[in-house]
Amino acid sequence: MTVSTFNRTWAKVIVNALLRYGVKHFCIAPGSRSTPLTLEALQLQQNQQAQCHSHFDERGLGFFALGIAKVTNDPVAIIVTSGTAVANLYPAIIEASLTHHKLIVLSADRPPELIGCGANQAIPQQGIFADYPIAGVNLPKPAEHYNAGWLVATIEQACITQSQQGGVVHINAPFAEPLYEADENAINTHPWLKPIQSWLINPQTKWINSQTIQSEVSMHENWDYWRTKRGVIVVGKLPVEQGIGIKAWAETLGWCLITDVQSCVDANLPYADIWLSNNTVHQRLLQADIVIQFGGQIVSKRVNKFLEAFKGEFWQVDEYSDYLNPFAHHQTRFVAKAHHFLRVHPPLRQKPWLLEPLALSQFCAGFIEQQVGGSLNEASLAHHIEEVLATSGNLFIGNSLFVRLVDALCKLPEGYPVYTNRGASGIDGLIATMAGVAKGSGQPTVGIIGDISALHDLNSVSLLNKISHPCILFVINNSGGAIFDMLPVEAQAKEQFYRLSHNYEFAPIATMFGIEYIRPFTWADLKAKLKLAYGRKGVTIVEIKVNDQDGSNLYKSLVKQISQAEIA
C-alpha cells in the first residue's frame, strides 16, 4: 500500500473514532498537509454521518466551531494544516477551555524528520496550546507496525476525558508525503484494519466502554438551619435547562434573587447593576446570613462588588470542579448542576426578609424607561432588546459596553437562550461565534456587537453567507471603543490609545460579502425593516449609528442618580 493510501486509512480511523463521541460537525480550513483528514471527514458527510464546514481564516473557524459547540453541547472537530494555521486557533481554544465547551483540534503536522531542520511550514506543534487542552495526543507518523486498536484506543481515551470534563482536546497528526492520489478502493480494505473491522462498520460501537462516574449531590448537613436564615441567591451563566426552578425556589425561601443576563432565569429583581449602586440597599443586602451563587462569569461590576464585600456563609454551585473564587471566600462548593442541587435542598416557605431591593428595582424600571427615552440608540436597544428577538430563537451578545448595558437595563424572557464569550471576555471572533450559534441551532439568531469588535472580526462576515435562515447581526457603531469612556484616563491618551475613534461605516462591508444591510434611524423604521428581514432567508446586518459617548454617559448617569436615591 502506498504512503498516500495508508495516510487515508489512518485518518479514517481517527475521524470514525470521533463519531462515537458525538462529533457531528467538522470545521475545515484549507491546507495541503491536512488532506487525509479533510477527505475522510468529507467521506463522513457523503455518508450523511456528519456535516463539514469551511472557512479561509483559522481564527474565525475556531470561533465558528465554538458557536456550534455552545448551541449543540456536542464536541466539534476542527481540521487545520501545519504551521501558524494551528496557532491561529489559540484564542478560540482559550475561550472554549474556560467555558468547558467541547472542541477537538485535529492539527496536521510535518513528520518528525522535518521538524527542527528548516523545512517549510514546520513548527513544533506538540503542546502548542500549553495547559488549555484537557487532553493532548501527539500521534506518530502513520505506520503499519502500530496496532490499529492502539490508534482507536488513544483517540477514544482523549474523548472520554473530554466527555467527563468538557473543554478542548488537541490531536496532532503528522503525515508524510505523498498526500494525494490514494487508491480509494484500498483505503477501506487494508489488512491493518482487520482487528478493528467490527468496530469500524458499526458507528455505535466504542472500543473503550467507560462507565461515567456517578456523583450525586447530597443535601448539606445544615440545610435545615440555613434555609430558615436570610439569604441572597446570585445566578451567573447557566444553561437554560439548569435555570428552571431557581426563581420559584428563591421566592419560596423569601430570599433575594439577583440574576446575570447569561443566567436564562427570569429576574424578579431586574436592573441589579443599577440599584446595587445605592449604598443603603447594598449595605442592607450585606446583612444576609448566606449567599448561594449558581454558575460564574458575572458581568455586573456592582454585583461583583457585593460578592466581594460579603463575609458570611458562601456556597458555590457549578457543574464543573473549576476553582471559582475570585474574592477568596471561605466557601462550601457543590460540584453539581443547579437543578440537581435544588432537588435535594427543598425550600422552607418564608416571607421576604428584605423589601428595599424590590422597591428600588421597581422604581428603576420606570426611571430607566424615562431616561432612555424613545430614540433609537444603544441604551434603548439594550433596554428593549426583547422587541428585536424572534419568538423562538437565540441571542448572542458581544463584549465591552453593550453586554453591560443589556445586563443593567433589560429584563429578558424566562428561558430565552443567551450566548456570550465571557470565558476570557475578548472581542475576537464574535461574528464567527454568532454564525456558529446560528448554524448549529438552525434557529433565528440575533447577534449584537460593537463596531471595534466587528472590525476585529471582519473576515468572519464571510461565514454569515453559510446561514440560510433569518438571522440579524446588529453592529452598534459609536465610532470607537466606548467602553473606555468609563475609564479615568486623560482625554488625549484615551482617544489615541484606548478609544481609537474612526469614521468607518459597515454598508460597504455588507456589499462586499453579499449580505443584506439596513441602517434604521428610528424605532418605527427598525421594526418595519426587521419584519422584512425576518421574512427572508439569510443574515441581515443592522448598523445602529450612535453618538460616541451617549451610551456610556447614560449608564454613568443612571448609576449616579440611583446611588443618590433616598431609601426610607
UniProtKB/Swiss-Prot annotation:
Q: Which UniProt keywords apply?
A: Magnesium, Manganese, Menaquinone biosynthesis, Metal-binding, Thiamine pyrophosphate, Transferase
- Keyword Transferase carried by entry: yes
- What's the top EC group for this one? transferase
Q: Which Pfam families match?
A: TPP_enzyme_C, TPP_enzyme_M_2, TPP_enzyme_N
Task: Provide a GO biological process annotation.
Answer: menaquinone biosynthetic process
Catalysed reactions listed for this entry: isochorismate + 2-oxoglutarate + H(+) = 5-enolpyruvoyl-6-hydroxy-2-succinyl-cyclohex-3-ene-1-carboxylate + CO2
EC assignment: 2.2.1.9
Q: What does the cofactor section's free text say about binding?
A: Binds 1 thiamine pyrophosphate per subunit.
Its annotated function is as follows:
Catalyzes the thiamine diphosphate-dependent decarboxylation of 2-oxoglutarate and the subsequent addition of the resulting succinic semialdehyde-thiamine pyrophosphate anion to isochorismate to yield 2-succinyl-5-enolpyruvyl-6-hydroxy-3-cyclohexene-1-carboxylate (SEPHCHC).
What family is this? Belongs to the TPP enzyme family. MenD subfamily.
Q: Which NCBIfam families match?
A: menD
Protein name (record)? 2-succinyl-5-enolpyruvyl-6-hydroxy-3-cyclohexene-1-carboxylate synthase
